[in-house]
UniProtKB/Swiss-Prot annotation:
Function: Myb-like domain-containing protein; part of the subtelomeric hrmA-associated cluster (HAC) containing genes that alter the hyphal surface (such as reduced total chitin or increased beta-glucan exposure) and perturb inter-hyphal interactions within the developing biofilms, resulting in a loss of vertically aligned polarized growing filaments. Consequently, this hypoxia-typic morphotype (called H-MORPH) with altered biofilm architecture leads to increased hypoxia fitness, increased host inflammation, rapid disease progression, and mortality in a murine model of invasive aspergillosis.
Native organism: Aspergillus fumigatus (strain ATCC MYA-4609 / CBS 101355 / FGSC A1100 / Af293)
InterPro entries documented for this protein: SANT/Myb
UniProt name for this protein: Subtelomeric hrmA-associated cluster protein AFUA_5G14865
PROSITE patterns to which the protein is assigned, alphabetical: MYB_LIKE (PS50090)
Entry-linked Pfam families: Myb_DNA-bind_6
């Protein structure tokens, strides 16, 4: 148990109240959860107007009555109990005359306490002096950070929770960095001329992006924070279902792509000309060498002529002189074109009747002697 010996000085202006935190700026206790539990003071703010009208408290930060490290160790011990609102006192003054001034807080609906001070007596002025604490820390009465306040955390346990303004931000950031993410807290200070507020909030956990395949669980709201093991148990079956679904889609895509022809592949390939049916079926391979295009075309036309009942014009094949002479003699004999075709086919390669007629009408008809003239000569000779 530590006793506070406070020094009060008259001050004409309203003092500046600084935020108080229960933590050391450079070292945390062994159990940070105990520290955060004790710092969770929902009713730790009070109005100091009525007290300041009677006396002006001024406690130098270099008068370290009880160091913050000793306070942190005391609060982190197993014997420390969480504070109760009815035992929080903002002024416990042990002066040489044995007079005390105290007040009790009353809590509002918003969780902050505004205390009505009932001072018993005014405290006389006392000269500044140096006070030593149990932590063997003694300092002079020079302070650049201004006025610090003190507060009673337990029944009978007095402590000065005074941290300079320059160390308040460092210590609060250090608490948030060194503590685990589940137990991190933000100590927010709002200091005014008449009241002191210390607001402890629980920092929001870092939101991790859930995979898109996991459905939003809207029906489970009031069950509290989700445990990692519970979340893992829910994620594993959903991932397995996603893998199976992906495999099914892949197989469907493969089968669908094999049945259809992509336009890109069709455009990339050059346009091929259709080959004749007879030339495509090359079953008879002769020993005369590779077939040329003309030979393949001739064989294809011969096959088509043989299969079709109607006469089809042959490809241009010139008539020889012997063929022209035989054709002239057959025509001169006065045979029908069917007989001429048969006799001509017996001697030479087969020619169609139309081909023979065209050859006769274009070439041989002009050069052959007319039959009319010969008939007249014969008739005149007979006379």
């Amino acid at each position: 148990m530590h006793t506070l010996h406070l020094i009060f000085e008259p001050r004409p202006k309203a003092p500046r109240l600084h935020a108080l935190i229960v933590a050391d700026a450079f070292q945390l206790p062994a159990n940070p959860s105990r520290l955060l539990q004790t710092t969770k003071l929902e009713c730790l703010a009070a109005s100091m107007q009525r007290i300041l009208s009677h006396y002006q408290p001024r406690v130098r930060t270099n008068h370290s009555v009880l160091s913050s490290r000793a306070v942190a160790q005391h609060l982190g011990s197993d014997n420390a109990d969480p504070p109760r609102p009815e035992t929080i006192l903002y002024a416990q003054n042990h002066d040489p005359f044995g007079r005390k001034s105290s007040f009790l807080p009353r809590c509002a609906d918003n969780g902050l306490c505004h205390a009505d001070a009932n001072p018993v007596s005014e405290v006389p002025e006392s000269p500044p002096s140096t006070v030593k604490s149990s932590g063997d820390a003694s300092v002079s009465d020079k302070d650049d950070d201004g006025l610090m306040d003190r507060c009673m955390l337990h029944d009978g346990a007095k402590g000065l929770l005074a941290v300079p303004r320059s160390k308040v931000q460092t210590s609060s950031g250090q608490v948030a960095e060194t503590s685990p993410p589940q137990l991190s807290r933000k100590v927010i200070q709002n200091a005014t001329s008449s009241s002191l507020y210390i607001k402890v909030e629980r920092s929001k956990p870092s939101s991790r992006k859930r995979p898109s395949c996991i459905a939003l669980e809207t029906d489970e709201k009031a069950s509290g924070p989700r445990i990692r093991a519970r979340l893992g148990a829910k994620v594993q079956p959903s991932l397995g279902q996603v893998v199976e679904k992906f495999k099914r889609q892949a197989t469907q895509h493969d089968t669908g792509s094999s049945m259809c022809i992509k336009p890109e592949s069709a455009r990339s390939k050059p346009i091929r000309r259709k080959r004749p049916a007879g030339a495509a079926l090359e079953t008879d391979e002769k020993a005369s060498g590779p077939q040329t295009r003309a030979r393949a075309r001739a064989e294809a036309s011969e096959a088509s002529e043989a299969s079709s009942p109607l006469p089809i014009a042959r490809s241009a094949r010139p008539y020889s002189a012997a063929e022209d002479d035989i054709l002239q003699t057959l025509v001169a004999r006065g045979l029908a074109w069917e007989e001429i075709e048969k006799e001509f086919g017996l001697r030479f390669a087969k020619r169609t009747m139309r081909s023979l007629q065209m050859r006769w009408s274009r070439k041989l008809k002009l050069t052959a002697p007319s039959t009319r003239c010969s008939k007249r000569k014969r008739s005149s000779a007979s006379l």
